[in-house]
């Protein structure tokens, strides 16, 4: 029997989907670091599965930009230059501002409750230093807000941009001080949402994003 955890979904996950979820967890938890080689054989042995579903999962992560394939060498966790991060974060700024403005009038009480819950889960995970859980809650928080805009094509692009920097986000959240700072930023974002203040919301999202980029810039280009 496979040692991969089974997803709690209405339809049974395929082995490839289970492998993909496991690899995503390794990326966001920092078990797989930028530049690290990922071999099909090692992954297959560690999860107790055959190579075929591992190969399929690795291809998905390559398409998302989280892995790169080098001929005759295999797969590696993507390494980004600071210029790459700056481009990605600028694209996020433009797309997320658009969705934030569209989403704000559509946010109902039920959605706001879910978003607040995600922020609380993010903070609690940060306090216990569970980076993988914190990153998952962080996504639910941000995407829960933006998805209210009902712009699926823009949302798909935003998800791809987030995916491409996930290993670096894990590095950012490894800092206790930055985890606390992020929790405070989420509270300010929620306050702007509660006030239905679009300009304030955009400003808080920009500040939150800019802080993450500044930390990553320092990591990639130390003084």
State where each predicted segment sits.
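Hydrophobic packing residues in well-ordered alpha-helices of helical domains and bundles
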Residues: 88, 115, 134, 138, ...
